[in-house]
Amino acid sequence: MKVLLCCAGGLSSSILMRKMKTWADSHGEDLDIIAVGTAEAVEVWQDGYECVLLAPQVSYRLKEMQEEIKIPVAEVPSLDYAIGNAENVMKLAHKLCDK
């Protein structure tokens, strides 16, 4: 599964990204994920990504991103993002990517 994880600049989402990679590895899943800012996501989504997950702090851009990006886009729930609940965020990614 190939996922874009977006926040304002890609910094805070990199923490969740590492947790998601660890979770995927421990469950034998193939996860290709990068953490980027929303501006970069608009530029790179066509590189084979299957879905985009938005950090809560940029959720105000959800509708705009859904119009610009032609793959599924969803907001990561605030609590899951804050505590780094990789399992719940992976479930969201699976749902978006029909996995």
Please provide the spans of the model-predicted regions.
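Conserved active-site segments centered on acidic
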Residues: K2-E40
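Ser/Thr/Gly-rich flexible loops in soluble cytosolic domains mediating phosphotransfer, phosphorylation
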Residues: V3, V73-K99
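Short acidic active-site motifs
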Residues: A39-V44, R61
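CheY-like receiver
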Residues: V44-W45, L92
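Short acidic/histidine-rich motifs immediately flanking catalytic phosphotransfer sites
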Residues: D47-C51
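Short secondary-structure boundary segments
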Residues: P56-Q57
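Short, structured coil segments at secondary-structure junctions
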Residues: E68-I71
